[in-house]
Amino acid sequence: MAKNVVIVESPAKAKTIEKFLGKDYKVVSSYGHIVDLPSNELGVDIHNGFKPNYLISNDKKNLIKELKSLTATAETVWLASDEDREGEAIAWHLAETLKLKNENTKRIVFNSITKSAIENAIKNPRTIDYNLVNAQQARRVLDRLVGYELSPVLWKKIKSGLSAGRVQSVAVRLIVEREREIQDFKTQSSYRITAEFTTSEGKVVKAALPKNFDTQAEAEAFLQQNIGAHFKVQSLETKPAKKMPAPPFTTSTLQQEAARKLHFSVSKTMTVAQRLYESGFITYMRTDSVNLSQEALSTAKNAIVQLFGEQYSQVRNFATKSKGAQEAHEAIRPTDMSRSSIPAETDQNKLYELIWKRTLASQMADAQIERTTVKIEADKHKEYFVANGEMVQFDGFLKVYLESTDDEEEEQEGMLPNLKKGEVLANRYITATERFTRPLPRYTEASLVKKLEELGIGRPSTYAPTISTIQNRGYVERSTLEGEVRPYHQLTLAGNVITPKTLSERVGADKGKLIPTDIGSVVNDFLVNHFDTIMDYNFTAKVENSFDEIAEGKENWTEMLSDFYKHFHPIVENVEKHTGRETGERILGTDPKTGRPLSVRLGRYGAMAQIGNPDDAEKPIYASLLAGMSIETITFEEALKLFELPRQLGIVEGKNVEVNVGRFGPYVRYGEAFISLDKGEDVFSVTLERAKQLIGEKKKADAPIATYQGVEVTKGVGRFGPFIKWNNTYINVPKKYNFDHLTQQDVQELIEDKLKKESEKVVKEWDEGTIRIEKARWGRFTLIKGKTKVELPKDTDVAAFTKEQALALLTEKTPKKTTARKKTTAKK
């Protein structure tokens, strides 16, 4: 019997905390939320104050029994879940579900898992903050209402399996709108003038004209003016400047900087940060505060003075700009500022070092800079060239850390040679280069987080799940675009001669940027057209502010939900009744062969092109869009070319060979075999020779690798990874095996292990196993015949269960076959 029971969310956190507390304390984990809304129904009583119907998760029932047993005999129960709204809700659910008594239940919070933080929390317990609980409930219930009512509308009007959400749908809207801005952007060209000069000592000075010329003719005329010109320094201005360090990390700035510097995804950053927090290396990682505690300020100063000297220290208190940051007590920082690295795996070390450097730099002196601007004049015209230079006089915080930017082409100013006013310079060359205006860049995961934060949409705990959700739903994907080659012109004046050149550059290429899919664009347009309030950026931000007000006790959560729902629900009902289906259809033109309309739209299996209409006497012809094509951007010519598929390539060993595109991408068909093309391979460029190569590789891959009990064993790679196939049974191959070189012993081991597991699952069988009862999860049993499965009631006596009972249940479960009624031909 434990005198004190401490309940935290994760086992890793429990393990770390248990090291700091004595033998009188037992630290256990709730493994996250122990209750949630049901997955198969709304779970909210709309007519009774929006009361949630919380259910204990099936996988937590045994855990609840254990926790009840532990807490029933404990003198004190300490609820030590995280210090945010989710953590407060977990503490409340534990108190309610375990029926804890107020007199011996204490709520403790800490923003770092260190001995001093834990001991301090034990000394300063509090009660559950119901304002925070209600703020979490309001978010959970409102998001359930939106998702549960909007998603079925999408199933009826667009496609089954779709979903909508208050934050996720707005995030998709941002990405769709940015993509359309890029597609609609009209590029304008101008000519940028750059030059290179030298001093009498041969030192190089690079300069540029402050303005661009609109046309090539204007640029060439300017170069003509410089033929035979003499150049000198017109003016030289030197000014002191300083650079200040960035504040310590919040959740969003950590996600952004980890993406730029470490190339981590947002979800990876949060996973790694969670491990660092649970191991006691950093403070809590879901925060929008830039504050540092007095203890942190003091330890940071000590570390800076010890490492770099007193002159590098400058204690700073940063102001938190983000709304709703009242719950977060501190920025993300190391728990021990004297530790620059940790005993952990590579990714954890990388992120820790980033946090350590950023925190340390935030408490360091400004960098002192000397900026020099030089104007260079010519004797043949009134324009002047400008050269900029920068010299670091005192590096300050730059000794440790420099924040990255999203601008990949930002120019860095270098040092200039010593120059004097009136000094004569020799010109090496002057170049007029055609440059083009660029649209705003596509969002990265990190820049999307930044935009959501700027708009007040979401909170630290929601950024990563939102970005994961919109990708998992197939509304957005991280894509690599090859772009296209664009020519540009350049004129160079050197030795009093102007030389023209035509060069080329690749534009529109993007890697790892967020791009909307066709389904994402169609869903977005439907929601914007019919649910403009939900999709409004200001409304979404206003809802977040309401949650903040609830957390502060300034707003009633059920009244807030009632006000929202009375406006929202009637719109849902109206859209269900009065709107048609949405496919994102675009009419591209007329098929020259048939005279029928050529269009593109969203179909059951994705984007497709279509010749003709369903109402025509002649059935429409369909073709799938290729990877990289989009309903919004495909041209008439590109769509028409799709109908050249399938392409007949010839005959190989008496079997027809063709190339085509299907649900899962482009493929070569060889008889009845389907062979996928390599990623990025052009379906229109595949030759018969290439097809033969693929067929040969397929035959080799499908050849038996072994036999077992006289039956051949083959191998392959499927959706769930590598497998072997024996006797129509698929068996996954774990990583511990060398899949490329499986031995007979490996194969035998894999098959026998599979057979053993299958036999252990079967508790009763009839007709040589064609009808059987198998063990299922949670102590239940499943009756199986072929593909038909029936879950037996929990109180079923399997030992006494008869074949007749089994057949009766299976007959009841098997759907009756119905004869399709012949359709009546429409009258013309």
Place the predicted regions along the sequence by residue.
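C-terminal or mid-to-C-terminal helical accessory/interaction module adjacent to the motor/catalytic core
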Residues: I113-F197, T238-K242
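Metal- or metallocofactor-binding catalytic centers and their adjacent structured scaffolds
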Residues: D214-P248, Q255, K420-A426, T431-E434, ...
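Intrinsically disordered, low-complexity regulatory segments
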Residues: M1-R140, E149, P210, G309, ...
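A conserved hydrophobic secondary-structure block that centers on an alpha-helix together
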Residues: Q255-E257, K261-T269
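Accessory interaction regions appended to the cores of large information-processing enzymes
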Residues: P11, S29, P152, S169, ...
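Short acidic, hydrophobic short linear motifs in intrinsically disordered regions
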Residues: V233-L236, M244-A258, I282-T287, P439-K451, ...
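Basic, low-complexity terminal or inter-domain segments flanking catalytic cores
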Residues: A2-N4, T16, Y25, T97, ...
